[in-house]
Amino acid sequence: MNRFTTELFELVNNENGYIFYKLLINDNFLFDYFVERIKNSPPERTRLKTIFAYMDMFSKVLLPKTKFRNIKGVDRKDIFEFKSGNVRVYVILQCPHIYVVAGGFKTEQDKDIKRIVQQIKGFQL
């Protein structure tokens, strides 16, 4: 069984009352692996910065499905993705808290979602 802990996600300062956290699974923040993977790719880093801007201004009313959407076809209804171009950031939305889980690419989306769903089984706050 995975062990979950959270820490404040300091890269986001939401203007609308949402609080963003890192979701650590067994002391690992999966999102860090994605950031490491794109560190030498300026286009992907730019898209990630765009997603951080979306997170800063996030409110359910503001963002269209082209930037933020619920992940369909999984048992959990609280898994969402922020997206810009081919870059995805997967989160769990439990208002007013948003837990950043992982990042990925559109081309690997199905595989990423399956992996995330498996790894967050049992996560509740």
Describe the role of every protein-language-model region.
Residues M1-N86, C95-I98, K106-L125:
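Basic, Lys/Arg-enriched alpha-helical interface segments
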Residues V101:
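Conserved catalytic cores of phosphodiester-cleaving nucleases, focusing on short active-site segments
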